[in-house]
Amino acid sequence: MAYLSFKSNMERTPRESNTPCPPPQPSPSLFSSLPDDIVLNILARISTSYYQTLSLVSKTFRLLILSKELDMERSYLGTRKPCVYVCLQSPTHPFDRRWFGLWIKPYDHQPLTHWTIDIKCTGHWLLPMPSPYSRCLQIVHETVGSETYEIGGQNMTPSTDVWVYDKLIGKQRKAPSMMVARKNAFTCVLDGKLYVMGGCEADESTHWAEVFDPKTQTWEALPDPGVELRYSSVKNIQTKQGKVYVRSNKKNFVYLIKECMWEVAEENLGESTCEIENVCYCYSNKRYWWYDAKCEEWRLVKGVSGLYEYYKTDSEIGNYGGKLVVFWDRAVSRLTATKEIWCAMISLEKGHDGEIWGHIEWLDAVLIAPRSYALSHCMDFLQ
């Protein structure tokens, strides 16, 4: 199990002798003398779990590891693998977010037929993502066609900058700037347009939300959603039936595109959502649901009812290589200032009856964190 610590536990030991050490012998820098394209090809074949260490070798390595060229090379070689990150957020400081990546011990998983609290440790952990990786995760990414948009400043200060990376030609360019500076904004794509909301001052009523049209390369401000939404804590944004839904800690809202107006959403949006193989899943009312597009209704994921009795708090869900990954927290004791973050991996299968069945592969405590920090959301992609 990993531990969330904000202080380094590395201590230097004093030298036992005053004898000066001989100067280190210069080592041949054969690897660093290679052309960048050769280095990128080599790095693309290495597991991303080593990137954090390699980024400390030199500034050149760090820039290459964080570059879009490396991402393109991994896509070309087919070495990208699914990954999922979970965010822990301070309730008193909304922008104090700590990112952790799920590290899974490589071995063959067998679905659990029965399990109790005293499950054998699986060796899976949530590992902290140090700077600059955690900052990169907080930069908003959204894909429209073959283009990936980056919204927000690299140094995590509010910014109007928008960068576009075209996977087809492998080049990056700067897009027209937003109308207001943002950081940690929420985005979604609907009908080929990019919607951006929040991430700015709550009193920014004119441009709290705006939409970008890639065809005309223009930004347009959306109507003011009102004080109640602007001053609430936005949880996520999702699209459904040609509408944009915003879930907050107070109420749920919907933006009606054709009418150009905001309304309070009466329907249940789910507390956490993700998409797996073109099927939308959500966690709501202590249950896991999937959306049947043909019947236009939410249906229960079957086979995972035992998981419902295992925790009392809300959970966050994500997509890990086609499997449903679930995170929740569990208090160890009322007397302690820490709590456990638990994780479950669920494989999914559609039965002959048209229902989706889940099979719990494993679950375990993967992190010990300060009790004051709350699970915010998951982010999943190929890395």
Curated annotation (Swiss-Prot):
Residues 28-79 form the F-box domain. PROSITE patterns: FBOX. It holds the Pfam family F-box. GO terms for biological process: response to cold; seed germination. Kelch repeats lie at residues 147-192, 193-239, 272-318. Keywords: Kelch repeat, Repeat. Residues 1-27 are annotated as: Disordered. Involved in seed germination. This is F-box/kelch-repeat protein At4g19330. The gene is CTG10.
